[in-house]
């Protein structure tokens, strides 16, 4: 895991003259790791819907590019444990215990599932917009001002 303390800024947000002690690691790999199916996660005959949704979200994450087969099995173990606690809490009518929830959260953090977890290990994901040509909303009055400025030779 990375260093303790507050989450560091993204590389493009930093202003520094010195080079970092541990620069952001970029890894190029050849080949892919096969993503296993979630499999049977049921506990007491039930699987909480959040478990399946979480596994689907993990599969769609860009961070899985760095996952090895052991990471996938660890993800399945973490989700199986979370499922057990969610189902048990539902049947007992009590929330998940704080210590158990902390342990599960640490397991999930080790999988680099959140922005903060990834930044701690100096891994950044940049998603390109789906439509690189569109998406910018411009006020009509701004467009008119720009056209008037061009027409009058002001720029």
Curated annotation (Swiss-Prot):
Start and end residues of each stretch annotated as Disordered: 1-24
Protein's recorded name: Gene 5 protein
Skewed-composition ranges (Basic and acidic residues): 8-19
Native source species: Mycobacterium phage D29
